[in-house]
Amino acid sequence: RTARTLKSVGINVNFAPVVDVNSNPANPVIGKLERSYSADPEMVATHARIVSAVHKEHGIVTTFKHFPGHGSAWNDSHVGMADVTTTWADSELIPYRRAIEANELDAIMTAHIFNANFDKDHPGTLSKRVLTGMLREELGFEGVIYSDDMQMKAVADFYGLRSEERR
């Protein structure tokens, strides 16, 4: 029904589905708001691929988010830093892997999460190691990469646009 409604009003891109694995039910922006399909990454992958397929039937591009995974965070990146260095698991990539392997993923949206195991200096959205190394080279994704809102506090308060322009 969502895809049909979006098409009827002229929308052709949906920044959905959320493919974050519900690995932390207390996560203030994923778990507590029930934005995840499941704590089981395979279930998340299956549901997301179904949602994406239905959207495509209606001519709507979907955007899997939030890469590389926001489900294990204890904090909301809208209001501050969300460090997943000790909580993130490789299983959070499964929904992306399954869609990429099946050539069904058009676009992803980045997560402003910080993980020192990926990049000691930058959150996912600003990390070449995450976006080029992990997403493009390791996972083989060739589609569109969207940033989440750059005014979210996890980026704006720590990696403001002016400081990034100087790098």
Feature map (PLM): residue ranges:
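Active-site-proximal loop motif in hydrolases
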Residues: L6, S36-M43
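Active-site core segment of subtilase-fold serine proteases
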Residues: R1, S23-P25, M43
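Surface-exposed, active-site-proximal loop segments in enzymatic domains
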Residues: A26-S36, D76-V79
